[in-house]
UniProtKB/Swiss-Prot annotation:
A GO-annotated cellular component: cytoplasm
Family: Belongs to the zinc-containing alcohol dehydrogenase family.
Binding annotation for NAD(+): 175, 195, 200, 262-264, 286-287
Protein name: L-threonine 3-dehydrogenase
EC number: 1.1.1.103
Source organism: Legionella pneumophila (strain Paris)
Reaction equation(s) it catalyzes: L-threonine + NAD(+) = (2S)-2-amino-3-oxobutanoate + NADH + H(+)
Residues involved in Zn(2+) 2 binding: 93, 96, 99, 107
Gene name of this polypeptide: tdh
UniProt cofactor(s): Zn(2+)
Cofactor note: Binds 2 Zn(2+) ions per subunit.
Amino acid sequence: MKSLVKAKKEPGIWMQDIPVPEYGVNDVLIKIKRTAICGTDIHIYSWDEWAQATIPVPMTVGHEFYGEIVEVGKEVQGLKVGQRVSGEGHITCGFCRNCRAGKRHLCRNTLGVGVNRPGCFAEYLALPATNVIALPDNITEEQAAILDPFGNAAHCALAFDVVGEDVLITGAGPIGIMAAAIVRHIGARHVVITDVNDHRLELARQMGVSRAVNVKYQKLIDVANELGMLEGFDVGLEMSGNPMALNDMMKAMNHGGHVALLGIPPQETPIDWNQVIFKGLVIKGIYGREMFETWYKMIAMLQSGLNISPVITHNFPVDEYQHAFQIMASGQSGKVILNW
Protein backbone atom coordinates (compact mmCIF):
# COMPACT_ATOMS: atom_id res chain seq x y z
CA MET A 1 0.00 0.00 0.00
CA LYS A 2 0.99 3.64 -0.49
CA SER A 3 2.38 5.20 2.71
CA LEU A 4 4.20 8.33 3.91
CA VAL A 5 7.17 7.11 5.93
CA LYS A 6 9.82 8.69 8.11
CA ALA A 7 12.40 6.51 6.39
CA LYS A 8 15.64 8.29 7.29
CA LYS A 9 17.06 10.10 10.30
CA GLU A 10 17.16 13.41 8.48
CA PRO A 11 14.70 16.09 7.33
CA GLY A 12 11.99 14.81 5.01
CA ILE A 13 9.21 12.25 4.63
CA TRP A 14 9.17 9.68 1.86
CA MET A 15 6.37 7.95 -0.04
CA GLN A 16 6.91 4.19 -0.01
CA ASP A 17 5.02 1.01 -0.86
CA ILE A 18 4.66 -1.10 2.30
CA PRO A 19 2.48 -4.09 3.31
CA VAL A 20 -1.08 -3.57 4.52
CA PRO A 21 -0.90 -3.74 8.35
CA GLU A 22 -2.01 -6.85 10.17
CA TYR A 23 -4.86 -6.44 12.64
CA GLY A 24 -5.65 -8.38 15.82
CA VAL A 25 -8.82 -9.88 17.23
CA ASN A 26 -9.63 -6.63 19.06
CA ASP A 27 -8.66 -4.33 16.17
CA VAL A 28 -10.28 -2.97 13.04
CA LEU A 29 -8.70 -2.28 9.66
CA ILE A 30 -9.61 1.13 8.26
CA LYS A 31 -9.40 2.26 4.62
CA ILE A 32 -8.08 5.81 4.88
CA LYS A 33 -9.94 8.41 2.83
CA ARG A 34 -8.62 11.72 4.15
CA THR A 35 -5.86 12.80 6.52
CA ALA A 36 -4.78 16.15 7.94
CA ILE A 37 -1.28 17.44 8.61
CA CYS A 38 -0.55 18.38 12.23
CA GLY A 39 2.16 20.54 13.73
CA THR A 40 3.59 17.31 15.14
CA ASP A 41 4.04 16.03 11.58
CA ILE A 42 5.96 19.21 10.73
CA HIS A 43 8.31 18.52 13.67
CA ILE A 44 8.80 14.98 12.36
CA TYR A 45 9.39 16.21 8.82
CA SER A 46 11.98 18.79 9.93
CA TRP A 47 13.62 16.21 12.22
CA ASP A 48 14.05 18.60 15.13
CA GLU A 49 15.43 17.72 18.55
CA TRP A 50 12.07 16.42 19.82
CA ALA A 51 11.58 14.20 16.76
CA GLN A 52 15.10 12.79 16.97
CA ALA A 53 14.48 11.76 20.59
CA THR A 54 10.99 10.37 20.00
CA ILE A 55 10.29 8.93 16.54
CA PRO A 56 11.35 5.38 15.60
CA VAL A 57 12.76 5.10 12.08
CA PRO A 58 11.45 3.80 9.72
CA MET A 59 7.75 4.36 10.53
CA THR A 60 4.56 5.53 8.83
CA VAL A 61 3.55 8.87 10.35
CA GLY A 62 0.29 10.83 10.75
CA HIS A 63 -2.54 10.67 13.28
CA GLU A 64 -5.45 12.80 11.99
CA PHE A 65 -7.77 10.85 9.68
CA TYR A 66 -11.14 9.88 8.29
CA GLY A 67 -11.87 6.46 6.79
CA GLU A 68 -14.16 3.45 6.52
CA ILE A 69 -13.91 0.08 8.26
CA VAL A 70 -13.00 -2.75 5.86
CA GLU A 71 -12.14 -5.54 8.33
CA VAL A 72 -13.19 -6.26 11.93
CA GLY A 73 -11.36 -8.47 14.45
CA LYS A 74 -13.36 -11.48 15.62
CA GLU A 75 -13.66 -10.18 19.22
CA VAL A 76 -14.84 -6.69 18.22
CA GLN A 77 -18.38 -5.69 19.10
CA GLY A 78 -20.33 -2.57 18.17
CA LEU A 79 -18.47 -1.84 14.93
CA LYS A 80 -19.03 -3.21 11.44
CA VAL A 81 -17.58 -3.14 7.94
CA GLY A 82 -18.58 -0.03 6.01
CA GLN A 83 -18.91 2.32 8.96
CA ARG A 84 -17.54 5.86 8.61
CA VAL A 85 -14.96 6.44 11.35
CA SER A 86 -12.24 8.57 12.84
CA GLY A 87 -10.19 7.60 15.86
CA GLU A 88 -8.48 8.57 19.10
CA GLY A 89 -4.75 8.72 18.42
CA HIS A 90 -3.62 7.96 21.99
CA ILE A 91 -3.41 4.24 22.71
CA THR A 92 -3.60 3.72 26.47
CA CYS A 93 -2.48 0.74 28.55
CA GLY A 94 -5.73 0.01 30.40
CA PHE A 95 -3.90 -1.10 33.56
CA CYS A 96 -2.39 1.98 35.22
CA ARG A 97 -4.21 3.78 38.03
CA ASN A 98 -5.64 6.50 35.78
CA CYS A 99 -6.85 4.06 33.13
CA ARG A 100 -8.56 1.92 35.77
CA ALA A 101 -10.12 5.06 37.28
CA GLY A 102 -11.61 6.08 33.93
CA LYS A 103 -9.10 8.87 33.28
CA ARG A 104 -7.46 7.34 30.25
CA HIS A 105 -6.23 10.68 28.89
CA LEU A 106 -3.82 10.71 31.85
CA CYS A 107 -2.35 7.26 31.13
CA ARG A 108 1.37 7.33 31.88
CA ASN A 109 2.01 4.62 29.27
CA THR A 110 0.30 6.27 26.29
CA LEU A 111 1.50 5.40 22.79
CA GLY A 112 0.78 7.88 20.01
CA VAL A 113 -0.43 6.80 16.58
CA GLY A 114 2.11 8.11 14.07
CA VAL A 115 4.50 8.98 16.89
CA ASN A 116 5.31 5.77 18.77
CA ARG A 117 3.51 3.29 16.48
CA PRO A 118 2.59 3.26 12.76
CA GLY A 119 0.33 6.10 11.73
CA CYS A 120 -2.50 6.95 9.36
CA PHE A 121 -0.63 8.49 6.41
CA ALA A 122 -1.26 5.30 4.47
CA GLU A 123 -4.02 3.59 2.53
CA TYR A 124 -4.86 1.42 5.53
CA LEU A 125 -4.60 1.76 9.32
CA ALA A 126 -5.03 -0.93 12.00
CA LEU A 127 -6.41 0.49 15.24
CA PRO A 128 -7.77 -0.98 18.50
CA ALA A 129 -11.57 -1.01 18.33
CA THR A 130 -11.77 0.89 21.62
CA ASN A 131 -10.09 3.86 19.90
CA VAL A 132 -12.40 3.91 16.89
CA ILE A 133 -15.11 6.59 16.75
CA ALA A 134 -18.13 5.80 14.57
CA LEU A 135 -19.43 8.96 12.92
CA PRO A 136 -22.95 10.20 12.17
CA ASP A 137 -23.74 10.90 8.52
CA ASN A 138 -23.93 14.67 9.01
CA ILE A 139 -20.23 14.95 9.91
CA THR A 140 -18.40 15.71 6.65
CA GLU A 141 -15.26 13.87 5.58
CA GLU A 142 -13.18 17.04 5.98
CA GLN A 143 -14.53 17.68 9.47
CA ALA A 144 -13.91 14.05 10.40
CA ALA A 145 -10.27 14.32 9.30
CA ILE A 146 -9.61 17.11 11.84
CA LEU A 147 -11.52 15.72 14.83
CA ASP A 148 -8.23 14.99 16.62
CA PRO A 149 -7.10 18.65 16.79
CA PHE A 150 -10.69 19.79 17.21
CA GLY A 151 -10.69 17.53 20.27
CA ASN A 152 -7.59 19.28 21.63
CA ALA A 153 -9.43 22.57 21.20
CA ALA A 154 -12.59 21.23 22.83
CA HIS A 155 -10.73 19.72 25.80
CA CYS A 156 -9.07 23.08 26.42
CA ALA A 157 -12.10 25.29 25.72
CA LEU A 158 -14.36 23.20 27.96
CA ALA A 159 -11.88 22.98 30.85
CA PHE A 160 -13.63 25.84 32.67
CA ASP A 161 -17.05 27.48 32.62
CA VAL A 162 -17.02 30.14 29.89
CA VAL A 163 -20.73 30.99 29.69
CA GLY A 164 -21.01 34.79 29.96
CA GLU A 165 -17.27 35.08 30.59
CA ASP A 166 -14.54 37.05 28.81
CA VAL A 167 -12.03 34.68 27.21
CA LEU A 168 -8.46 35.36 26.06
CA ILE A 169 -6.82 32.92 23.64
CA THR A 170 -3.10 33.30 22.91
CA GLY A 171 -2.06 31.61 19.67
CA ALA A 172 -4.15 31.66 16.48
CA GLY A 173 -3.03 28.35 15.07
CA PRO A 174 -5.78 25.96 13.93
CA ILE A 175 -6.39 24.67 17.47
CA GLY A 176 -6.59 28.17 18.94
CA ILE A 177 -8.98 29.26 16.19
CA MET A 178 -11.22 26.24 16.78
CA ALA A 179 -11.16 26.90 20.53
CA ALA A 180 -12.34 30.44 19.82
CA ALA A 181 -15.24 29.09 17.78
CA ILE A 182 -16.16 26.68 20.58
CA VAL A 183 -16.25 29.23 23.39
CA ARG A 184 -18.26 31.60 21.21
CA HIS A 185 -20.68 28.75 20.34
CA ILE A 186 -21.31 27.83 23.98
CA GLY A 187 -21.89 31.36 25.25
CA ALA A 188 -18.74 33.32 26.08
CA ARG A 189 -19.21 37.10 26.07
CA HIS A 190 -16.02 38.60 24.62
CA VAL A 191 -13.55 36.30 22.83
CA VAL A 192 -10.15 37.83 22.10
CA ILE A 193 -7.39 35.94 20.26
CA THR A 194 -3.78 37.11 19.85
CA ASP A 195 -0.96 36.24 17.48
CA VAL A 196 1.62 37.90 15.22
CA ASN A 197 0.42 36.09 12.05
CA ASP A 198 -2.10 38.25 10.19
CA HIS A 199 -3.22 35.40 7.93
CA ARG A 200 -4.30 33.27 10.85
CA LEU A 201 -5.81 36.23 12.69
CA GLU A 202 -8.04 36.76 9.64
CA LEU A 203 -9.11 33.10 9.85
CA ALA A 204 -10.00 33.71 13.49
CA ARG A 205 -12.16 36.67 12.48
CA GLN A 206 -14.06 34.37 10.13
CA MET A 207 -14.78 32.12 13.12
CA GLY A 208 -16.51 34.94 15.00
CA VAL A 209 -14.05 36.27 17.58
CA SER A 210 -14.73 39.65 19.18
CA ARG A 211 -11.21 40.83 18.41
CA ALA A 212 -8.24 39.27 16.60
CA VAL A 213 -5.20 41.14 17.87
CA ASN A 214 -1.73 41.35 16.36
CA VAL A 215 0.27 42.04 19.51
CA LYS A 216 3.09 43.59 17.47
CA TYR A 217 0.83 46.57 16.85
CA GLN A 218 -1.83 46.61 19.56
CA LYS A 219 -1.84 46.18 23.33
CA LEU A 220 -4.25 43.87 25.13
CA ILE A 221 -5.12 46.54 27.67
CA ASP A 222 -6.32 48.82 24.87
CA VAL A 223 -8.48 46.05 23.39
CA ALA A 224 -9.99 45.29 26.80
CA ASN A 225 -10.83 48.97 27.25
CA GLU A 226 -12.46 49.11 23.81
CA LEU A 227 -14.67 46.17 24.77
CA GLY A 228 -15.67 47.83 28.04
CA MET A 229 -13.89 45.23 30.17
CA LEU A 230 -13.03 46.69 33.56
CA GLU A 231 -11.49 43.77 35.44
CA GLY A 232 -9.49 41.58 33.05
CA PHE A 233 -10.21 38.23 31.41
CA ASP A 234 -12.02 35.47 33.28
CA VAL A 235 -10.67 32.51 31.31
CA GLY A 236 -7.38 32.17 29.43
CA LEU A 237 -6.53 29.48 26.87
CA GLU A 238 -2.79 29.42 26.10
CA MET A 239 -2.23 27.72 22.73
CA SER A 240 1.04 29.19 21.48
CA GLY A 241 3.78 27.85 23.72
CA ASN A 242 5.31 31.33 23.49
CA PRO A 243 6.78 32.55 26.81
CA MET A 244 5.88 36.19 26.15
CA ALA A 245 2.29 35.26 25.28
CA LEU A 246 2.02 33.19 28.46
CA ASN A 247 3.17 36.04 30.68
CA ASP A 248 1.02 38.57 28.83
CA MET A 249 -1.93 36.31 29.57
CA MET A 250 -1.12 36.18 33.28
CA LYS A 251 -1.02 39.99 33.40
CA ALA A 252 -4.35 40.27 31.56
CA MET A 253 -6.27 37.84 33.80
CA ASN A 254 -8.83 38.96 36.35
CA HIS A 255 -8.37 37.97 39.99
CA GLY A 256 -9.69 34.45 40.46
CA GLY A 257 -9.29 33.73 36.74
CA HIS A 258 -8.76 30.30 35.21
CA VAL A 259 -6.00 29.43 32.72
CA ALA A 260 -5.77 26.29 30.57
CA LEU A 261 -2.35 25.53 29.06
CA LEU A 262 -2.20 23.53 25.82
CA GLY A 263 0.79 25.17 24.13
CA ILE A 264 4.17 23.72 25.08
CA PRO A 265 6.67 26.43 26.11
CA PRO A 266 10.44 25.89 26.34
CA GLN A 267 11.39 23.97 29.49
CA GLU A 268 13.09 26.94 31.16
CA THR A 269 10.24 29.41 30.60
CA PRO A 270 10.04 31.89 33.52
CA ILE A 271 6.63 32.81 34.93
CA ASP A 272 5.78 35.85 37.05
CA TRP A 273 4.45 33.87 39.99
CA ASN A 274 3.28 37.07 41.68
CA GLN A 275 0.58 37.22 39.01
CA VAL A 276 -0.50 33.67 39.82
CA ILE A 277 -0.37 33.88 43.60
CA PHE A 278 -1.75 37.34 44.32
CA LYS A 279 -4.49 37.00 41.70
CA GLY A 280 -5.41 33.51 42.91
CA LEU A 281 -5.23 32.10 39.38
CA VAL A 282 -6.14 28.48 38.72
CA ILE A 283 -3.87 26.86 36.11
CA LYS A 284 -4.61 23.54 34.40
CA GLY A 285 -2.46 21.61 31.93
CA ILE A 286 -4.29 20.13 28.93
CA TYR A 287 -3.10 17.14 26.93
CA GLY A 288 -5.00 15.27 24.24
CA ARG A 289 -8.70 14.61 24.65
CA GLU A 290 -10.71 13.17 27.54
CA MET A 291 -11.61 9.63 26.52
CA PHE A 292 -14.23 9.72 25.39
CA GLU A 293 -16.25 12.56 26.84
CA THR A 294 -14.50 15.13 24.65
CA TRP A 295 -15.43 13.12 21.53
CA TYR A 296 -19.11 13.03 22.46
CA LYS A 297 -19.16 16.75 23.15
CA MET A 298 -17.38 17.81 19.97
CA ILE A 299 -19.60 15.68 17.74
CA ALA A 300 -22.66 17.10 19.52
CA MET A 301 -21.40 20.65 18.97
CA LEU A 302 -20.94 20.01 15.25
CA GLN A 303 -24.43 18.54 15.06
CA SER A 304 -25.86 21.58 16.87
CA GLY A 305 -24.51 24.08 14.37
CA LEU A 306 -20.85 24.77 15.21
CA ASN A 307 -19.02 25.33 11.92
CA ILE A 308 -15.27 24.61 11.93
CA SER A 309 -14.94 24.30 8.14
CA PRO A 310 -13.34 27.77 7.64
CA VAL A 311 -10.23 26.50 9.45
CA ILE A 312 -9.69 24.02 6.57
CA THR A 313 -7.91 26.07 3.90
CA HIS A 314 -6.17 23.57 1.61
CA ASN A 315 -6.88 20.17 0.02
CA PHE A 316 -4.26 18.18 -1.90
CA PRO A 317 -4.06 14.71 -3.45
CA VAL A 318 -1.62 12.67 -1.41
CA ASP A 319 0.86 12.56 -4.28
CA GLU A 320 1.36 16.32 -3.71
CA TYR A 321 2.26 15.79 -0.05
CA GLN A 322 5.58 17.64 -0.32
CA HIS A 323 3.79 20.83 -1.38
CA ALA A 324 1.15 20.27 1.31
CA PHE A 325 3.83 20.05 4.01
CA GLN A 326 5.45 23.24 2.70
CA ILE A 327 2.12 25.08 2.87
CA MET A 328 1.48 23.87 6.43
CA ALA A 329 5.01 24.79 7.56
CA SER A 330 4.73 28.28 6.04
CA GLY A 331 2.17 29.45 8.59
CA GLN A 332 0.02 30.77 5.72
CA SER A 333 -2.70 28.16 6.12
CA GLY A 334 -5.23 26.66 8.44
CA LYS A 335 -5.64 22.90 8.34
CA VAL A 336 -4.26 21.11 5.28
CA ILE A 337 -6.03 17.94 4.06
CA LEU A 338 -4.48 15.07 2.09
CA ASN A 339 -6.94 13.08 -0.04
CA TRP A 340 -6.20 9.38 -0.43
